[in-house]
Amino acid sequence: MKKKIGISYTEANFQNYEQWFTAQDLGDDLEIIILSFIKNNTEDISKCEGFVLTGGIDVQPSLYGGDMEYAYRPTAFLPERDQFEKLIYEYAKSHRLPVLGICRGLQYINILEGGKVFEDIGELSNGIHKRATVDKEHRITIVPDTLLHSITEVDRGIVNSAHHQAIRPDMLGNNIMISAYSDTDGIIEGIEYKDKTNKAFMLAVQWHPERMKRKEESPFSRNIKSAFINAVRTHKYADL
């Protein structure tokens, strides 16, 4: 039986996430399953052995004690998505299953661990990070001796960017550490568990590795995907 990778559904460019995992990547032993807050197929969560938490609309500020009014606030939030992805993350964590967070996924993991985000990073930083007609690009630095550094095997590089929120460095979640940051303004670009003892693979990035221009060449896409897939392939259920 094939191991399943569950990708949380987003209404924003979901096809990019599906297409990122090619037939060659998945081989004969892995397959993708869509975990959709619209279908509310919670029964499929327990069928998966790895999860991708995708990008998309802002998380409800009420979940982290944030302000309800701010720049670029969406006209409506998706509380059903927030609840659905909370179930995914809690299941993954309790069963020690690999998780990859992307953009909103990074922010939501920090929130679920008790941390907070900036509701909006401000016009100066938005000029660097917020998508206009196309993704922005900027330089990041990888923190030494982190999981992300061991995966990418580089100290610095260029990533794409399409966000107006970011993790507050003074409000990191429980057991969360920074693994990358923007060179220009210090915005947090990567997180992972600080204490990895008896923890499964968990890596989250603020950029979009699934839609980088040269994703098959970039260590910020190719290496991350390979590491996550390997974590799913080699995962063995822990004694819980």
Language model features with spans:
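Cytosolic ligand/metal-binding cores
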Residues: 107
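Active-site-proximal beta-strand elements of phosphoester/diester hydrolases
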Residues: 203-206
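N-terminal beta1-alpha1 cap of cysteine-dependent amidohydrolase-like domains
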Residues: 1-100, 111-118, 122-155, 164, ...
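Short basic/aromatic active-site micro-motif
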Residues: 161
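Conserved G/P- and acidic residue-centered "switch" motifs that form tight phosphate/ATP-binding loops
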Residues: 103
